[in-house]
Structure formats: C-alpha cells, structure tokens
C-alpha cells in the first residue's frame, strides 16, 4: 500500500499513463493524490478526466484554477480558448457526467495520520487548519449547489486580497478560491499579491512566496501543492513539496511516493513548447 502524489497533469494523458505504470500503481491497494489542474494545455484533457474518474475512491484530488475555468466554460460563463485544447472534452458524449463529477471534487485534502495537507496553490499563512477547512467547505458547497454558475461568474478577480473572518458572501468565496487555486506571493503581513508570476529570485521586494512565511498550518503539517511550474519543485522548505514541474510546457510530470519520499519523473512529450507564456523556458 503506497500513497502517490502527482503534480499538475494539464491534459498530459500519455505521461500520466506512463508514470502510473512505472510505479505499478494499483487502485485496489494504493492511493493517488493529484494537485489539481487535471485539464487544459495538453491534448488529452478528456482522457485524463475519464481515467481519473474511473479510479474511484483510490483518488484524492483537489481542484485547480484551470479545472474551475473549465467548469465556467462549460456553463457558458467564460470563453473557450483554443490554447487550452479542451474542445474535445466540451463536445464529448459524456461531458455532462464528467463536468458534474468534477464540480463535486474538493479544494482541500487533509490526512491527519500523515500530517499532510494538499491544495492546488497552497495555504495562506493567515489561516489555521480549522479556518482552511471551513473556507474549503464553503467553496465546495456552492460548487455542488444549483447556484454554482453564479459563483463561477463571480470568482474571477483579485480582491479582496486580505483575510478577515468578517468576509462574507461572494467576496469571501473569491478570497478562498484565490488562496486554494491561484496564490503564489504574499506581502509580509500575509496579504495576497495576485499579479506576480516570477520565480522568487526575480520577484520584487517585499513580496514573499506564501510558503516562505510562517503560518499555523505549515508549522504542524507537510503541505503539497502544484500550480507554480516555474519553481520546478525547487526552493521550498523541506516539508513543503511543489509538484508542478511543467509537463504541459515541455518539462516533466512528477510523482512523489509519500512513504519514502522517492520521486519518479517522466519527461513531457511536448519538448518543443515555445509559447511566450511558457513559465519554465525563462
């Protein structure tokens, strides 16, 4: 019985199949944790969702910003961008089933026995675990509800960018969504800065990566996240693991076996990705 954690897949179906085969993943006895952003950029988003859904209870995943964007596109709220390569998924005969399954997935995973927390972008140092769990439940509840299109329409935006227990309604949901799925940098007081995507050595003062600021969760738990491909898994504290290594950009798909902290990496089959948006090419 092993627990495997895999970084952002982004529709890289072939690489996902290869890495699962390499570690001989067995859904009957093993558990697979996925950091979110299952879809977009790669050509196999449809196949990735079908595979992950077929694995049933052996999978523990969290939603990423691209997964939420897919939900918004399918609901007619956001535009389908050709660069995301999700048209085959949107037009698939089982699209309704896949989308309804996806919107019922969590934004936070916690294993108390392993002292392990996973969120796509991370956990703000302003939260303790009880607050993170409460905010996650609120986002998850609205995604499962009939009013989820209203939330998807309102989730885009960078404000509010500072936590207060007094936040309520859509403003509170937007802040929580940004923490769980979009956050990279904070100011020293923990306030979010949502525009900078540079690597830490290029970021302007006084910005700090969220994981560089002490917080109640990181003091007691290991944290696994994705989202930040330009880190290439480097530069985090020893108990915080960034697993997005830019597979959809020509990097690698990374897997971590939790029991012995052993890494497995599969090179992307998109070695010629030259988009100006490529975060790992700089």
Curated annotation (Swiss-Prot):
The keyword Hydrolase applies. It catalyses: P(1),P(4)-bis(5'-adenosyl) tetraphosphate + H2O = 2 ADP + 2 H(+). It comes from the Bacteria. Its EC number is 3.6.1.41. One of its GO terms (molecular function) is bis(5'-nucleosyl)-tetraphosphatase (symmetrical) activity. The keyword Cytoplasm does not apply. It is an enzyme of class 3 (hydrolase). Keywords: Hydrolase. It holds the Pfam family Metallophos. Belongs to the Ap4A hydrolase family. NCBIfam families: apaH, PRK00166.1. Hydrolyzes diadenosine 5',5'''-P1,P4-tetraphosphate to yield ADP. PANTHER family: CYTOCHROME C5, PTHR40942. This is Bis(5'-nucleosyl)-tetraphosphatase, symmetrical. It comes from Sodalis glossinidius (strain morsitans). The gene is apaH.
């Amino acid at each position: 019985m092993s627990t495997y954690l895999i970084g952002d897949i982004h529709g890289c179906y072939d690489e996902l199949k290869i890495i699962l085969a390499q570690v001989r993943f067995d859904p009957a006895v093993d558990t697979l944790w996925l950091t979110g952003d299952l879809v977009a950029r790669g050509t196999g988003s449809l196949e990735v969702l079908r595979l992950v859904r077929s694995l049933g209870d052996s999978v523990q995943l969290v939603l990423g910003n691209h997964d939420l964007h897919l939900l918004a596109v399918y609901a007619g709220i956001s535009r389908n961008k050709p660069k995301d390569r999700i048209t085959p998924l949107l037009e698939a005969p089982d699209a309704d089933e896949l989308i309804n399954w996806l919107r019922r997935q969590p934004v936070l995973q916690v294993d108390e026995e392993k002292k392990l927390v996973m969120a796509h972008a991370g956990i703000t140092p302003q939260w303790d675990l009880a607050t993170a769990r409460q905010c996650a439940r609120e986002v998850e509840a609205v995604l499962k509800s009939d009013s989820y299109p209203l939330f998807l329409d309102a989730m885009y935006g960078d404000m509010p960018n500072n936590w207060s227990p007094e936040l309520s309604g859509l403003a509170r949901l937007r802040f929580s969504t940004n923490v769980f799925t979009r956050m990279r940098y904070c100011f020293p007081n923990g306030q979010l800065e949502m525009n900078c995507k540079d690597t830490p050595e290029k970021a302007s003062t006084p910005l700090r990566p969220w994981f560089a600021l002490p917080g109640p969760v990181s003091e007691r738990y290991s944290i696994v996240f994705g989202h930040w491909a330009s880190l290439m898994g480097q530069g985090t504290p020893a108990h915080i693991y960034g697993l997005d290594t830019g597979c959809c950009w020509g990097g690698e798909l990374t897997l971590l076996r939790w029991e012995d902290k052993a890494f497995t990496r599969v090179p992307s089959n998109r070695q010629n990705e030259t988009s100006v948006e490529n975060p790992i090419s700089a």
